[in-house]
């Protein structure tokens, strides 16, 4: 009996450590400095990426709630967006920028991958980043008057990270695994890990409503199919930057989908 209890405690502790690894990878939130790390653990932590999205979404929703008590909605939106960038270290935005530079500026697969590794921002990346941030501001401005706007943020942050993480499941990793920060994530996911991602995203979305969730699922599945085919054609697989781009683009698609839904009911 005691052995069984000890085994359960060890399992729970291990899963908590995986979750904290996911938090440390995707955010600037503090985690214990003695947290065990290995590439295998980091790869397994991918199952909790959507749950990290829940945490980040809730924190951003709280910032918006308190700032809009003091400032106009537009100012509260800008402050919340700034907080989100600080919270994540602009991790996903950086991926979107690098992917845009690489695929936009490279004429061959090798050149595209080489440009993605360059830390400098080019024309394609700068334009894409500006458009993405502007789009987020405009879309939030359209949704801000919904009584459950805070929940929209949580759902978008959660589902977009789930979608990005699932690309690891059925796409080859094509970056230089010796130098890439995303190397630990490059291994294939198990079906159970994908199921955890989808379950987390599904539960969060259902709080918006079954119909809204259905529309979001349809749109994101269509996007994933198209984005996967596009990446395969352009670079033959995915890189860490592509995962960041997938998160950013799918987050914007969630907002667009909900605007279209509420506009036509």
From Swiss-Prot:
Membrane topology, as annotated = Multi-pass membrane protein
The alphabetical list of record keywords is:
Cell inner membrane, Cell membrane, Cobalamin biosynthesis, Magnesium, Membrane, Transferase, Transmembrane, Transmembrane helix
A GO cellular-component term linked to this record? plasma membrane
Q: What Pfam families does the record tag this protein with?
A: CobS
Q: Does the keyword Cell inner membrane apply?
A: yes
Question: Under which pathway is this protein filed?
Answer: Cofactor biosynthesis; adenosylcobalamin biosynthesis; adenosylcobalamin from cob(II)yrinate a,c-diamide: step 7/7
Q: Does the keyword Chaperone apply?
A: no
Reactions catalysed: alpha-ribazole + adenosylcob(III)inamide-GDP = adenosylcob(III)alamin + GMP + H(+); alpha-ribazole 5'-phosphate + adenosylcob(III)inamide-GDP = adenosylcob(III)alamin 5'-phosphate + GMP + H(+)
Q: Which molecular function term from Gene Ontology is one that the record holds?
A: cobalamin 5'-phosphate synthase activity
Q: Which cofactor does it need?
A: Mg(2+)
Compartment(s) where it occurs, according to its Swiss-Prot or TrEMBL record:
Cell inner membrane
Transmembrane stretches, start-end: 51-71, 72-92, 121-140, 203-223
Q: Which family does it belong to?
A: Belongs to the CobS family.
This chain's function reads:
Joins adenosylcobinamide-GDP and alpha-ribazole to generate adenosylcobalamin (Ado-cobalamin). Also synthesizes adenosylcobalamin 5'-phosphate from adenosylcobinamide-GDP and alpha-ribazole 5'-phosphate.
**Name of this chain's protein:** Adenosylcobinamide-GDP ribazoletransferase
- Identify the coding gene: cobS
């Amino acid at each position: 009996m005691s052995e069984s209890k000890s085994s359960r405690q060890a399992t729970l502790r291990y899963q908590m450590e995986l979750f904290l690894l996911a938090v440390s990878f995707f955010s600037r939130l503090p985690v214990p400095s003695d947290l065990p790390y290995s590439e295998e653990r980091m790869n397994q932590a991918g199952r909790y990426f959507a749950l990290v999205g829940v945490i980040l979404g809730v924190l951003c929703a709280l910032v918006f709630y308190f700032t809009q008590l003091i400032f106009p909605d537009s100012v509260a939106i800008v402050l919340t967006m700034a907080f989100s960038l600080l919270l994540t270290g602009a991790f996903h935005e950086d991926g979107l920028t690098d992917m845009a530079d690489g695929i936009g500026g490279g004429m061959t697969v090798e050149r595209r991958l080489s440009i993605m590794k360059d830390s400098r921002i080019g024309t394609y990346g700068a334009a894409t980043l500006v458009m993405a941030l502007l789009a987020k501001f405009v879309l939030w401005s359209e949704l801000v008057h919904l009584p459950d706007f805070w929940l929209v943020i949580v759902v978008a942050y959660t589902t977009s990270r789930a979608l990005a993480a699932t690309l690891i499941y059925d796409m080859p990793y094509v970056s230089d695994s010796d130098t890439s920060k995303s190397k630990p994530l490059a291994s294939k996911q198990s079906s159970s890990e994908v199921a955890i991602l989808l379950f987390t995203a599904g539960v969060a979305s259902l709080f918006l409503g079954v119909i809204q969730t259905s529309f979001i699922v349809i749109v994101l599945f269509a996007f994933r199919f198209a984005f996967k085919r596009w990446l395969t054609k352009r670079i033959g697989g995915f890189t860490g930057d592509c995962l960041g781009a997938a998160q950013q683009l799918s987050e914007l698609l969630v907002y667009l989908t909900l605007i279209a839904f509420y506009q036509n009911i």
